Each structure stands twice: as structure tokens, then as C-alpha cells.
């Protein structure tokens, strides 16, 4: 039993051990599983973060249009970092040491400030003395523009006595530099010397002034100049230096003034045309300054308020500014001249001001002055001042101006002209001063072994290079007139100086045939351009001459035909003097001028007399012609005191447009009579004849069309003038005959009995109105505003196309010159309505005056 119990105990112990082992194994598996899960999570998180970083890095790299894998992104990142490290190393090597400049300034800003502080400018000179680069700070120091110095010789700006010294310095180093390497040129070639340089002036006629300067610089090899340079230095070298130059060495120096300037003449304007506004009192004190002013003039508003503007102006500009301000106070607005304004940095800046006066809105008194100041560059100021002085600008500026004057399609390429001629001037010679001597004095090229050629003794103005072809072209354009110019001769004369210069220039031994052919080709191209321009000018001359010839022919036609009109601007109308109408054979001149007032009367057709005559016009200009009588078979007969047969020539319809006065006076030497005024407005010249006739029943008949006969009353006056109304039906011009023809066969229209009855009535009315003769001027004045009856005698016409003029108002005018057209054979009073009775009485009063003024011996018997 004991064995059995022990066995059972041992089995129970074994079971417990197995279960504990199994449990331990399960626990270990659970722990491992948890670790693996945790490890997988952390690994996934790391991979996700890595992918995000790779993606972000790939998006920052250039050229990420396509999706890149991780290795490509990492490779490009490595390349970028390596390149950035190299650039940083180069920048550190070329960077100015931090103990020199503040950290907030760039290299260019610090260089500009250093030049201004040192009163200096950069200058690059070739070993022969030609200037290839100059910085803009030369303007504030020597008043030269950079364009004045570039491509010039340094000897043009140095006194003649210092030429040999400067030339010796440059040429000596030229001989030494032949055996030096570019590395030696960088370390062992510093040079320093002093000389005088010419100051620039606005007026070249002013006496020359020289400034003592110091050159400090090194010789640089142009072969080692980097391709990326600042301030256009590379462009200047490429334009100026040709492959023919063998040395390729230039002297780059900092030029400083020996005597510092406490106040600069002017500062360099980086952005011209900047503006700012200020407000001044009538005493020219600052009242307001806008926010744009401090960056330009340096002053804050509170620093200038209450101060006078004259405190900041240059002393040389005060007189001109005072005149401008006087003009402002006189006219209320204006524009100032160019003047210098002192900035806070003690520099002069050029300004121009537009100003006007504002007035109080209640009392209209001047309140203050509003000014708009514009910054201008010194180049613009100098160009304007030289234009006022009549001095031509330097060659680049004048060439640009002249190219703008010519047409855009036919403009001469002045840049190519300049460069083509510069190829000859820049031809290399063994002499280092030959080029400067040619530019300064146009003398012969010096011998290679001789001393440098000196500039002319007259150094009052800096010599400028003059291109012969440009001079000829300027002279040709200035002296150009209306006469024609031979294009071939002009073209040859223009190009001959340049060709002769090219022929006289010594050709160096090293110049190739290709360069010579290129120069000749440039000259041929220049010649073709000049000839083309000349042909264009000649064509313009011929065209203008043809137009002038046509105008002269028209003037001769007008003067030859004789009628002249004088326009008087003081009168509202047109004053026609001594008008003469033309007809058949004899000539009868008018004596009194025609005055037409009032309105413009267009005349489509005017036909009068036997033939359909009208006032002849030539190209809408009234032409003076003499009045001529025609044959008796084409006459219109009218009974008058002293009548003559007249007629007007039959001409084609014309249009007459002229402003007419209220009175048109046509003189006639005869006594007063009844005047018929025939006129027509035919639509067709072939219409049948129309005659206005009177029948025995005293009724007026019109054969064709709607016609209205103006009632005209005549009274003989010494001057014998005919008054024409200003308002006429259909705008027709009324022309009355000065003389009238009588024929026996046309006098039968009115009987003798009617004449006797009329004479009796006239005598009775004269007796009744004798007490009223004292009031005659008043009655005549009132009669001008009333229509007067008239009787028109029938006219027998030999030419068919006739119609009578239609008018609607009475002729009126000055009583002393008025000829009231009265009826020589008036109808009975019953012919007219009762309203005309008083008018007829006034007619009889004028008739009485006519009888007293008319010479009975000149009146033909009825």
C-alpha cells in the first residue's frame, strides 16, 4: 500500500510539473507575441515617417515632375548640398571681411558707399589710354556722364603737360607685362600716380577747370575676366575690344579726389521720375510734406515744416527760381526750371516742380501753393540747358535724336554707323597714343617710336570725336532746301571722307584680309543707307515742288479772272467790294461796293436777263468780271429814266455760298425806275420759258411754278444803289440790273391813259403830303420795316429758259444810299388790297423826292 501511495504521490507531482511547464511556455509565447507586435508597430511608424520625409524632400528638389524613388531623391539631395557647399565656399572667399562692412549691407551697396565716402570712382583704361569703363559716381565728382568718357582717350581729359608722364607710366608697364603671367599681374602690378582731370560743364564754352586726382589700381588681364561681371563691364569690353588687340591688358583703378568735397555737386539718381508732393504758404514755407519725400530728400516732414524752401536751393539757381515764383504769383500755376535741392545727406539732387495756387472756397483768396516735385537726372538737365544755349549734345545723344526725327521705316542706323567708323578709329597700331591723337585733333598717326601726340593747345573744352559722315549728314539736313539734290553725288560726297580716312589709315601687319573686307563691307552698307536716304529726300522735294506748282497755277487762275473779295473778321458778314458782272461786248464798271450782311445764302442757280445768266464762280470763289452789254435781240426792256440794255452771259449752273449783309447795294448811274428782277431755280436747263405778265384786268399771272415777285419801289438817288433783302425764298441771291433797256415794241404793256391817270394821282398826293415833308426821315425809316408795292413791267424774252426770282422781304437800308425801286408805270390802287394804301402813299412821297433829284434832260419820254 505504501508503494501505491508513493506512486500516486509521484504521479501527482509529475502532473503538476507538466502543467507548470506548459503554463510557463504559454506565458513566454504571449510575451514574445506582444513584443513582436510592438516591434512591428514601431517599425511601421518609422517607415511611414521615412516615406513622408522622402516625399517632402522630393517635392523640394527641382525637376520633380515625375515620381522619383527614394534613392533618386537622396542622390539629388546630395548633389544639391554639395553644390551649395561649393558656392558658399566661393562666396566666403570673395566676401568682404566682416570687420569692414556691416552685415546688413550687400557687396554692391558697400562698394557704392565706399566710393562716395572716398570721393572716388572706378576707371578701366587700356594701355593706349582708351577708357573702356567708368562708374556712375564720376558724375557727382567731375560732372561727366559715363557716356562722355567711355570710348574716349584719357589724354583728352588730362592737361597737355602731363601727357608724357601718364603715357610713360602706361607704356612702361606694357613692356614689362609681356613677360608676366596672369598670376603675376594679380600680385605684382599695383600702380599709383596723380594727375589732373578735366571737369565737365554744361556750357562747353566755359573756361576749363581741372581737378587734382589720384589713381590707385592694378593691371588686369582681360583674358581672365569672368563671364559674369557687374555694371555692364563685360559688355563694354566685348564692344570695344576687337580680336586685333594683342595685349589684352587694362588698368583698373580707383580715382579719388585729392581734395574731398563736403557737399557733392549732385548724387546719382537710381530711379529718375520719382515724385513727391509738398504744400507751401504764399511766403514759400513748408506746410505739408507727403510720405514719398523722405526716401528722396532724406528729411522727415517735421524737419522741414515751417522752414523756407529757399534754404534748400542752390545759390546759382535762386535767381531763376525767383522768376518762376513771380510767374506763379501772376498766373496762378506754372512749371519751374531745373534746380538743385540739398538733401539731408549733403548732396544736390536735381528737381523740377509743377505748382498751382489754391483759393479759399468762401472768399476766393489765395490760400496756399501745391507743388509736385519730380526728380530728374543730370543728363536730362544738361541736355535741356545745352538746347537752350544752342549747343549740340555729344555724338551718341545727337545720333539718337536725329534717328527719332526721321521716319521709323526710313531711319538711318546710327549705331551701326558709329560702330562702322569706330572700326577704323580702333584699328590697332604699335603707337599707344595714335588713337587718342586721331580722336582729339584728327592729325596724322604718329610714328611707333615717337612720343605721344598731344592734344590741341586750346583746352577750354574737352575735345570730342567727330565722325565725318555724321558731320556731312548734319550739314546736309540743316542746309536742306526746296531745290533737288543729286542722290549719287550726295551719297558719294557723304561717304568720301570716311573712305579717304580708311585709305589713309595705316594697316597693321597683323591685320588679316578678312578684317579688311569686313570693314569695306560695313562702309559699303553705310553708303547704301545714305544713298537710300538721299533718294527719299529727293522724292519728297519733287512731291513738294509739284504741289507748289499746282498752288501757283490756282493762284494765277484766281488773279487772272479778276473778282476779289475781302473778308473782314470784325463784321459778321462778307464785304464785297466793286463787284462787276460779266456779259457780252461792252464793259460797264460798278461804282458802289456790294455789302451783304446777315446770313449765308447758298445759290444753286442764278439766271437773270434774257439769257439764263448767273454770277459766275470758279471753285467756290467769286470772280470779278466786267458788266457787258449784249445784242438787242437778247435784251430785256424796262421803262426807266436812264436805261441801258444789259444782260448776263448764259453759264452752267454753279453754287455760290457767301454770308450776306442785310443790304446788298449795286450801283447804277441811272435815275430811279421800276426794276424787274428775273431769276430762276430751274431743275432742268431745258425747261420752257416762263414770263410774268400783266393783263388788262390788272391781275398778275405766272406761267410756270410757284413764283412770288417782290414789291420794289424805286427812287433815283445820286449813287444809284439797289438794295437786296437778306431773306430770300430758296436762298437765291438777288441781283438787280444797274441799267435797263427800253424798246419801243415792249412799251405797249401800259397805255398812255394809265400814265396820265397815275401822274394826276401823284400830283394830288404830293399836295396832300407837303406838310409832312419835315417828317420824311421818320417815314422813310418806318418804310424800311414795311413791304412796298411795286408794279413789274412784262418782259419779252428771246431766250426760252427764263424764270423770275422769288423773294419774301422788302429791301431796306440806309436812306442816304437806298434806292427804292418804284414802279415807273404803277397800276391802279385797286390792284392791291386796302392794307397797302398807306404804303402806296409813302411810295408817292419817295416819288416826289425822285422828281426833285432827277435830271429831266436824262429821262426818256414815255
Curated annotation (Swiss-Prot):
Keyword DNA damage among UniProt keywords: yes
Single biological process term from Gene Ontology: negative regulation of DNA-templated transcription
UniProt modified residues of type Phosphoserine: 38, 42, 408, 427, 431
Domain PAC: 336-379
Domain spans labelled bHLH: 34-84
Polar residues bias locations: 405-416, 447-461, 638-652, 853-862
Covalent cross-link Glycyl lysine isopeptide (Lys-Gly) (interchain with G-Cter in SUMO1), where: 67, 858
Main location: cytoplasm
Descriptive protein name: Circadian locomoter output cycles protein kaput
Organism lineage string: Eukaryota, Metazoa, Chordata, Craniata, Vertebrata
Amino acid at each position: 500500500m505504501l508503494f501505491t501511495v508513493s506512486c500516486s504521490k509521484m504521479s501527482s507531482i509529475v502532473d503538476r510539473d507538466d502543467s507548470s511547464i506548459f503554463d510557463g511556455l504559454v506565458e513566454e509565447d504571449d510575451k514574445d507575441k506582444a513584443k513582436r507586435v510592438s516591434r512591428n508597430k514601431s517599425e511601421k511608424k518609422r517607415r511611414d515617417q521615412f516615406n513622408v520625409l522622402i516625399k517632402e524632400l522630393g517635392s523640394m528638389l527641382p525637376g520633380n515632375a515625375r515620381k522619383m524613388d527614394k534613392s533618386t531623391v537622396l542622390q539629388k539631395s546630395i548633389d544639391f548640398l554639395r553644390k551649395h557647399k561649393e558656392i558658399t565656399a566661393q562666396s566666403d572667399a570673395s566676401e568682404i571681411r566682416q570687420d569692414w562692412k556691416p552685415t546688413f549691407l550687400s557687396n554692391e551697396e558697400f562698394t557704392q558707399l565706399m566710393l562716395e565716402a572716398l570721393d572716388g570712382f572706378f576707371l578701366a583704361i587700356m594701355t593706349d589710354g582708351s577708357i573702356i569703363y567708368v562708374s556712375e559716381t564720376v558724375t557727382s565728382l567731375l560732372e561727366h556722364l559715363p557716356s562722355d568718357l567711355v570710348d574716349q582717350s584719357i589724354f583728352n581729359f588730362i592737361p597737355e603737360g602731363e601727357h608724357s608722364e601718364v603715357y610713360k607710366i602706361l607704356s612702361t608697364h606694357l613692356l614689362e607685362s609681356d613677360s608676366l603671367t596672369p598670376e603675376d599681374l594679380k600680385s605684382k602690378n599695383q600702380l599709383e600716380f596723380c594727375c589732373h582731370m578735366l571737369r565737365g560743364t554744361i556750357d562747353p564754352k566755359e573756361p576749363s577747370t581741372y581737378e587734382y586726382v589720384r589713381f590707385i589700381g592694378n593691371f588686369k588681364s582681360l583674358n581672365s575676366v569672368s563671364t559674369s561681371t557687374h555694371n555692364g563691364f563685360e559688355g563694354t569690353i566685348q564692344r570695344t575690344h576687337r580680336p586685333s588687340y594683342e595685349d589684352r591688358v587694362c588698368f583698373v583703378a580707383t580715382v579719388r579726389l585729392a581734395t574731398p568735397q563736403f557737399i557733392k555737386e549732385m548724387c546719382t539718381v537710381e530711379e529718375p521720375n520719382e515724385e513727391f508732393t509738398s504744400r507751401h504758404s504764399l511766403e514759400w514755407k513748408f506746410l505739408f510734406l507727403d510720405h514719398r519725400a523722405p526716401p528722396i530728400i532724406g528729411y522727415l516732414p517735421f524737419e522741414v515744416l515751417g522752414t523756407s524752401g529757399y534754404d534748400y536751393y542752390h545759390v546759382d539757381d535762386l535767381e531763376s527760381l525767383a522768376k518762376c515764383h513771380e510767374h506763379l504769383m501772376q498766373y496762378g500755376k506754372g512749371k519751374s526750371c531745373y534746380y538743385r535741392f540739398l538733401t539731408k545727406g549733403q548732396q544736390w539732387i536735381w528737381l523740377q516742380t509743377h505748382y498751382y495756387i489754391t483759393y479759399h472756397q468762401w472768399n476766393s483768396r489765395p490760400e496756399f501753393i501745391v507743388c509736385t516735385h519730380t526728380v530728374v537726372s543730370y543728363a536730362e538737365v544738361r541736355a535741356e540747358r545745352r538746347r537752350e544755349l544752342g549747343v549740340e549734345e555729344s555724338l551718341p545723344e545727337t545720333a539718337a535724336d536725329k534717328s527719332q526725327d526721321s521716319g521709323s521705316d526710313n531711319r538711318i542706323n546710327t549705331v551701326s554707323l558709329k560702330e562702322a567708323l569706330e572700326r577704323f578709329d580702333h584699328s590697332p597700331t604699335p603707337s599707344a597714343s595714335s588713337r587718342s591723337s586721331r580722336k582729339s585733333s584728327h592729325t596724322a598717326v604718329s610714328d611707333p617710336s615717337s612720343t605721344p601726340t598731344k592734344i590741341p593747345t586750346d583746352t577750354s573744352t574737352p575735345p570730342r570725336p567727330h565722325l565725318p559722315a555724321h558731320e556731312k549728314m548734319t550739314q546736309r539736313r540743316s542746309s536742306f532746301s526746296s531745290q533737288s539734290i543729286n542722290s549719287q553725288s550726295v551719297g558719294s560726297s557723304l561717304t568720301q571722307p570716311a573712305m579717304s580716312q580708311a585709305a589713309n589709315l595705316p594697316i597693321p601687319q597683323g591685320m588679316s584680309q578678312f578684317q579688311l573686307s569686313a570693314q569695306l563691307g560695313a562702309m559699303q552698307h553705310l553708303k547704301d543707307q545714305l544713298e537710300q536716304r538721299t533718294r527719299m529726300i529727293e522724292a519728297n522735294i519733287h512731291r513738294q515742288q509739284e504741289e507748289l506748282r499746282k498752288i501757283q497755277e490756282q493762284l494765277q487762275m484766281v488773279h487772272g479772272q479778276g473778282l476779289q473779295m475781302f473778308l473782314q473778321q470784325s463784321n459778321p458778314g462778307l464785304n464785297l467790294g466793286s463787284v462787276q458782272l460779266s456779259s457780252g461786248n461792252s464793259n460797264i464798271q460798278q461804282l458802289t461796293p456790294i455789302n451783304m450782311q446777315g446770313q449765308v445764302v447758298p445759290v444753286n442757280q442764278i439766271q437773270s436777263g434774257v439769257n439764263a445768266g448767273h454770277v459766275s464762280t470758279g471753285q467756290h470763289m467769286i470772280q470779278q468780271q466786267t458788266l457787258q452789254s449784249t445784242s438787242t435781240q437778247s435784251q430785256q426792256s424796262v421803262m426807266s429814266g436812264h436805261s441801258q440794255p444789259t444782260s448776263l452771259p448764259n453759264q452752267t449752273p454753279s453754287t455760290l455760298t457767301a454770308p450776306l449783309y442785310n443790304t446788298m447795294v449795286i450801283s447804277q448811274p441811272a435815275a430811279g425806275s421800276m426794276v424787274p428782277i428775273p431769276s430762276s431755280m430751274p431743275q432742268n436747263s431745258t425747261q420752257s420759258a416762263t414770263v410774268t405778265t400783266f393783263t388788262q384786268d390788272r391781275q398778275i399771272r405766272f406761267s410756270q411754278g410757284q413764283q412770288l415777285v417782290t414789291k420794289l419801289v424805286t427812287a433815283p438817288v445820286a449813287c444809284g444803289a439797289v438794295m437786296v433783302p437778306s431773306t430770300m425764298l430758296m436762298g437765291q441771291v438777288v441781283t438787280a440790273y444797274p441799267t435797263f433797256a427800253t424798246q419801243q415794241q415792249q412799251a405797249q404793256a401800259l397805255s398812255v391813259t394809265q400814265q396820265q391817270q397815275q401822274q394826276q394821282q401823284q400830283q394830288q398826293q404830293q399836295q396832300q403830303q407837303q406838310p409832312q415833308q419835315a417828317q420824311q426821315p421818320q417815314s422813310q425809316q418806318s418804310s424800311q420795316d414795311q413791304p412796298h408795292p411795286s408794279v413789274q413791267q412784262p418782259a419779252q424774252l428771246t431766250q426760252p429758259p427764263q424764270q423770275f426770282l422769288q423773294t419774301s422781304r422788302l429791301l431796306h437800308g440806309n436812306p442816304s444810299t437806298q434806292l427804292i425801286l418804284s414802279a415807273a408805270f404803277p397800276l391802279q390802287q385797286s390792284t392791291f388790297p386796302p392794307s397797302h394804301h398807306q404804303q402806296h402813299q409813302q411810295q408817292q412821297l419817295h416819288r416826289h423826292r425822285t422828281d426833285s433829284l432827277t435830271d429831266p434832260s436824262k429821262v426818256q419820254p414815255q
